[in-house]
Amino acid sequence: MDEAYYSGNLESVLGYVSDMHTELASISQLVIAKIETIDNDILNKDIVNFIMCRSNLDNPFISFLDTVYTIIDQENYQTELINSLDDNEIIDCIVNKFMSFYKDNLENIVDAIITLKYIMNNPDFKTTYAEVLGSRIADIDIKQVIRENILQLSNDIRERYL
């Protein structure tokens, strides 16, 4: 799919957009259906593992994050932005993104998770911040925010990126 997106072939691009649109809608419905059955500790652990590039795609919310990450990654803006920052700016970014976890806004939470995933692609930051990241996220309960906002966020992502 990624090659089709970059090839410039209109038919391939339209197929990619349609596939991602369908996948995002489908996974959003699965998240709504399954979110109550997922233990909060497991959800938080899976979020940390997603950020650290070890995804449990059996967790529907992690599958949702993976799909959003794939869609947004096509834009490459995030990678360019992260790569342009020095270490102090990245640390500031990490601190600012953590604040998003304490707000009842799923878009900000998903943005924070995906940005942290980009940052943790750097082995130096992964080594330094993995433990702190895990302990901070372990204290957060975002299931209610997910339940209430997943459909709207899914629609917003489709409108913005697809």
From Swiss-Prot:
Among its keywords, does the record have Transmembrane? Answer: no
Example GO molecular function: protein sequestering activity
Q: Name one GO biological process term.
A: symbiont-mediated suppression of host NF-kappaB cascade
Job description of the protein: Plays a role in the inhibition of host NF-kappa-B activation. Interacts with host BTRC and thereby diminishes ubiquitination of NF-kappa-B inhibitor alpha/NFKBIA. This stabilizes NFKBIA and its interaction with NF-kappaB, so retaining p65/RELA in the cytoplasm and preventing NF-kappa-B-dependent gene expression.
Write down what this protein is called.
Answer: Protein A49R
Question: Quaternary state and partners of this protein?
Answer: Interacts with host BTRC; this interaction inhibits NF-kappa-B activation.
Q: Which organism is it from?
A: Vaccinia virus (strain Western Reserve)
InterPro entries membership: Orthopox_A49
Q: Which UniProt keywords apply?
A: Host cytoplasm, Host nucleus, Host-virus interaction, Inhibition of host NF-kappa-B by virus
Taxonomic lineage of this organism? Viruses, Varidnaviria, Bamfordvirae, Nucleocytoviricota, Pokkesviricetes
Question: Which Gene Ontology cellular component terms are annotated?
Answer: host cell cytoplasm; host cell nucleus
Which Cys-Cys disulfides exist here? Answer: none
Tell me its family.
Belongs to the poxviridae A49 protein family.
Its annotated compartments are:
Host cytoplasm; Host nucleus
